[in-house]
C-alpha cells in the first residue's frame, strides 16, 4: 500500500520562483538614514522607477529567445539601438581573456549596452556594477556586484567580486568594468561636458595579467543638466535621478566608439590606468570631454 503525506507531495512539485518583495530597482537601502532613503524613493517614484518595474514584470511573462543575453533582452525592452561602425564592431576579440573599460556617461544604459555589444560576439560576459542593480534574479549570473556601503559586509562583497573578476579573466572570459566607479559628471554645474571620477587602480591589476587584451570603449553623451546640478547639491538626489535619465534615453541610439584591443602586461603598473583613460577619451567627439578632467564631489556633499 502506498502512503503519502502532504510534505512528500509538496516535494514532488517543481520549484516555482517567488516574486521579489519591494522594488526591484532602487538606489535606496534599509540601512540608509530615514531622510535619505525617503528622498531617494520619492524622487525615483516621481521620475519613472515604477515604469521600469512594470517593464520588468511584463518582460518576465514573455517567452524569451534562449540565444539572447540578458543585456540584449534589456536593451530591446528599452528600445535602444547601436550607432557603431562595422569596422569598430569587428575589433571585439572572439576568443581569449578580454578586459573592457569604458567611460560612464549615463549609468544603467552604459552597462547594458556594452554588455549587449560583447554578447553579440561571444557569450562569456560578466559586468561589474553597483550591487543595488543586481536585484533582478535573471541577471545575477551576468553581474558581479560592487557594494559602495561602508560596513564590513560591503567590504566583503567587493573583495569577493575582485577575486572573482581576476578568476573570470584568468579563465579566458570577458569582463566589463567602469573604472570611474560612478556616473560621469560636469566639473561645475553648468559645464558643457561630463567627466568620470578618477579611474580605480584595480584595472591595472586586471589589464596587466598575462594574455589579457584590453578593449577601450567610449560612449558618447552625458546626462541632463538637471542631473549635473543635482550632483553638486546632494548625492541622494543624484542617484535618485538615474531612472529619470534612463527613461530619457529610451528608444534612442547610443553612439559608441571602440579602440583596437591592446595588451598591457609589459606596461608599468603606474602607467596603465592613465594610459587607458587617455585612450578612451581620445575617441570623444570634437569638443567632448578630455581625460585630464576629473570630477570629484564638492566637500559639502555627503556621499
Regions found by a protein language model. Name each.
Residues 89-93, 135, 188-189:
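A short beta-turn/loop motif at secondary-structure boundaries
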Residues 81-90, 129-133, 162-165:
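Short, charged beta->alpha transition segments
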Residues 73, 113-116, 120, 167, ...:
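Residue-level signal for well-ordered alpha-helical scaffold segments within enzymatic catalytic domains
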Residues 75-80, 104, 151-156, 192-194:
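Short, flexible loop segments at the rims of nucleotide/cofactor-binding pockets, characterized by
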Residues 2-6, 158-303:
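Non-catalytic C-terminal accessory region of glycerolipid acyltransferases
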Residues 50-54, 99-154:
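Catalytic core of membrane glycerolipid acyltransferases/transacylases, capturing the structured
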Residues 2-101, 111-113, 120-124, 249, ...:
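Membrane-anchoring hydrophobic helices of lipid-metabolizing enzymes
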Amino acid at each position: 500500500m502506498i502512503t503519502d503525506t502532504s510534505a512528500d507531495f509538496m516535494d514532488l512539485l517543481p520549484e516555482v520562483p517567488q516574486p521579489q518583495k519591494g522594488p526591484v530597482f532602487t538606489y535606496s537601502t534599509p540601512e540608509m538614514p530615514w531622510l535619505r532613503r525617503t528622498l531617494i524613493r520619492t524622487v525615483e517614484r516621481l521620475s519613472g522607477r515604477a515604469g521600469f518595474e512594470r517593464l520588468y514584470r511584463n518582460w518576465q511573462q514573455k517567452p524569451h529567445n534562449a540565444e539572447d543575453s540578458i543585456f540584449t533582452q534589456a536593451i530591446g525592452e528599452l528600445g535602444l539601438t547601436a550607432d557603431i561602425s562595422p569596422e569598430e564592431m569587428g575589433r571585439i576579440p572572439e576568443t581569449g581573456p578580454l578586459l573592457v573599460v569604458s567611460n560612464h556617461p549615463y549609468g544603467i544604459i552604459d552597462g547594458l549596452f556594452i554588455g549587449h555589444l560583447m554578447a553579440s560576439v561571444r557569450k562569456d560576459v560578466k559586468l561589474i556594477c553597483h550591487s543595488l542593480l543586481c536585484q533582478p534574479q535573471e541577471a545575477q549570473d551576468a553581474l558581479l556586484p560592487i557594494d559602495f556601503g561602508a560596513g564590513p559586509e560591503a567590504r566583503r562583497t567587493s573583495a569577493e567580486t575582485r577575486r572573482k573578476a581576476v578568476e573570470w579573466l584568468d579563465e579566458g572570459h570577458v569582463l566589463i568594468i567602469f573604472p570611474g566607479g560612478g556616473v560621469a559628471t560636469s566639473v561645475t554645474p553648468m559645464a558643457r561636458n561630463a567627466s568620470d571620477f578618477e579611474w580605480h587602480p584595480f584595472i591595472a591589476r586586471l589589464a596587466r595579467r598575462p594574455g589579457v587584451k584590453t578593449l577601450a570603449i567610449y560612449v558618447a553623451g552625458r546626462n541632463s543638466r538637471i542631473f549635473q546640478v543635482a550632483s553638486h547639491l546632494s548625492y541622494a538626489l543624484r542617484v535618485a535621478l538615474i531612472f529619470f535619465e534612463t527613461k530619457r534615453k529610451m528608444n534612442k541610439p547610443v553612439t559608441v566608439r571602440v579602440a583596437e584591443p591592446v595588451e598591457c602586461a609589459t606596461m608599468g603598473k603606474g602607467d596603465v590606468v592613465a594610459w587607458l583613460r587617455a585612450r578612451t577619451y581620445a575617441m570623444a567627439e570634437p569638443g567632448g570631454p578630455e581625460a585630464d578632467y576629473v570630477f570629484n564631489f564638492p566637500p559639502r556633499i555627503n556621499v
